[in-house]
Amino acid sequence: GELHILDDDMNALPQGEPGTLWFKAATPFSYFNDTEKTKESTSADGVLTTVGDVGYLDQDGFLFLTDRATFMIISGGVNIYPQESENLLITHPKVADAAVFGVPNVDLGEEVKGVVQLMPGIQPSAAVERELIDFCNEHLARQKCPRSIDFEAELPRLPTGKLYKKPLRDRYWADKKSRIV
């Protein structure tokens, strides 16, 4: 098979730059009993398929998966992958777990939202929220940083241990028809 890392216009990306992973397999790819999802995951020419993973090749040719395309936040026309923000937040000594996703913003379409589970003994407060936002601003480009952070006693996880963002994100999109305002 073949693997390609492409931008939204199906152009190849240079080494080190993240993009959507597209593949060409020896046999046609399809989702079981879901022709619509199969069609959505196939390139216009019918040659390539994606399952929505985002990644890049390093200088040695190793593939790194960095996020899922469905988690991408589009804020003011900028594509933001939340994994980088999540990875940073969980390094803060007051953070036990973190989820980052897009929420509605009238001017930007979406804005970056953080939801954090604090370490035992740390109480949620406006001061802790400000500290975490400032921490992100020190280490990441401004557009990748949460504009606000909410606190949860525990973040939802699947039985496999994987973070389950959908119920968190759905709270903010409950009255919206689309993830793009």
Q: Where do the language-model regions lie?
A:
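Hydrophobic beta-strand positions
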Residues: 4-5, 56, 156
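Generic structural signal for residues in well-ordered beta-strands
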Residues: 3, 98, 149-151
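Acidic/polar alpha-helix N-cap and adjacent early helical turns
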Residues: 170-181
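AMP-binding/adenylate-forming catalytic core of the ANL superfamily
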Residues: 9-12, 22-25, 29-30, 39-40, ...
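Adenylate-forming
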Residues: 2, 31-33
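AMP-binding/adenylate-forming catalytic domain of the ANL superfamily
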Residues: 138-162, 181
